[in-house]
């Protein structure tokens, strides 16, 4: 009645292969060392073992909330990042309107002496850990207005900067690359390399 013959060989479950992408049949992220390590651990044990710090850093890199601090023309390129062509939210990088809800501040444009205290105040309102991306030549070092009496020669004189994105104005691709570098930097937080 459809019963398999009894054999003396023990029944062994199939070796788990990790997380399989249904469209390709290969493990997800097979060319990425980070995902390769996760897939190897899943294939070996069937579950993941991690420390709380690693879990928190993993969650932090995938759920960064950014706040715009658009001061000049670079802000237009920064806005492009949220549009459908680049869709930065697919990397877990979502915009927020309040500094109290954001982890990352993107300073885009020329920082004047009158605006510097406001920048510092907004930075101080952000919860720890907080990160700053300096976008464009003006934010990085004064840019075209470097010798002006009313311009701060780089926002790193006011707040600590984690990632510098060069350009006048930098493209949305350059800013997206800066976001990915920031996520990479957050992954290694807690090591000497920070």
Curated annotation (Swiss-Prot):
HAMAP family membership: NDH1_NuoB
Subunit composition and interactions: NDH-1 is composed of 14 different subunits. Subunits NuoB, C, D, E, F, and G constitute the peripheral sector of the complex.
Protein name as annotated: NADH-quinone oxidoreductase subunit B
Function per UniProt: NDH-1 shuttles electrons from NADH, via FMN and iron-sulfur (Fe-S) centers, to quinones in the respiratory chain. The immediate electron acceptor for the enzyme in this species is believed to be ubiquinone. Couples the redox reaction to proton translocation (for every two electrons transferred, four hydrogen ions are translocated across the cytoplasmic membrane), and thus conserves the redox energy in a proton gradient.
Transmembrane stretches, start-end: none
Catalysed reactions, semicolon-separated: a quinone + NADH + 5 H(+)(in) = a quinol + NAD(+) + 4 H(+)(out)
Family under the similarity heading: Belongs to the complex I 20 kDa subunit family.
The UniProt record lists the keyword Iron: yes
Organism of provenance: Rhizobium johnstonii (strain DSM 114642 / LMG 32736 / 3841) (Rhizobium leguminosarum bv. viciae)
Main subcellular location of this protein, as a coarse class: membrane
Alphabetic keyword roster: 4Fe-4S, Cell inner membrane, Cell membrane, Iron, Iron-sulfur, Membrane, Metal-binding, NAD, Quinone, Translocase, Transport, Ubiquinone
Cofactor(s) needed for function: [4Fe-4S] cluster
GO molecular function, one term: NADH:ubiquinone reductase (non-electrogenic) activity
Co-factor binding details: Binds 1 [4Fe-4S] cluster.
Binding residues annotated for [4Fe-4S] cluster, in chain numbering: 73-74, 138, 168
GO cellular component annotations of the record: plasma membrane; respiratory chain complex I
Top-level taxon of origin: Bacteria
Top-rank EC class of the record's enzyme: translocase
Xref: SUPFAM superfamilies: HydA/Nqo6-like
Keyword match Nucleotide-binding: no
GO biological process, one term: aerobic respiration
Gene name as annotated: nuoB
Membrane topology (UniProt): Peripheral membrane protein
């Amino acid at each position: 009645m459809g019963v398999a013959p009894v054999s003396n060989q023990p029944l062994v479950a199939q070796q788990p292969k990790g997380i399989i992408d249904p469209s390709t049949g290969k493990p997800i992220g097979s060319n990425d060392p980070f995902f390769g390590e996760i897939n190897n651990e899943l294939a070996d044990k069937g579950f993941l073992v991690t420390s709380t710090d690693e879990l928190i850093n993993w969650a932090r890199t995938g759920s960064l909330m950014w706040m715009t601090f658009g001061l000049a023309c670079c802000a237009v390129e920064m806005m492009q990042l949220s549009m459908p062509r680049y869709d930065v939210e697919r990397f877990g990088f979502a915009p927020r309107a309040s500094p109290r809800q954001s982890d990352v501040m993107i300073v885009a444009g020329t920082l004047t002496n009158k605006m510097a205290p406001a920048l510092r105040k907004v930075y101080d309102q952000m919860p720890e850990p907080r990160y700053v991306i300096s976008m464009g030549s003006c934010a990085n070092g004064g840019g075209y207005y470097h010798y002006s009496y009313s311009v701060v020669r780089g926002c790193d004189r006011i707040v600590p900067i984690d990632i510098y994105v060069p350009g006048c104005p930098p493209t949305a691709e350059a800013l997206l690359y800066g976001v990915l570098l920031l996520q990479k930097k957050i992954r290694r937080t807690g090591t000497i390399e920070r």
